[in-house]
Amino acid sequence: MMERITARKNPLLQQVRKLVSSRKERENSGLFVADGTKLLTEAVKWWPGLETVLLSDGVEADVPEHVRVVTVPKDVMESISPMQTPQGALFLCRLPE
């Protein structure tokens, strides 16, 4: 089941912003952020630590049922993505041990 987030101050979106901007936050939480539909496809195939996927409106992805999937408006995706031109798929993964 997909969730929908529209508020920029949502705790998940605030966490994503911190992970993007702070190495210390990534180390403390054990998570990292990646961006891109092709990279997401590879993460689904090969990365067991895939936890949460954020998708822009209109972007679809085939992810396992145990992975949290959240849709957001395009402007919200642009506000949290580390990329200048986001591809519409942002995801959180566990750092390797």
Predicted regions and their residues:
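Arg/Lys-rich RNA-binding interfaces used to dock onto structured RNA substrates
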Residues: 1-97
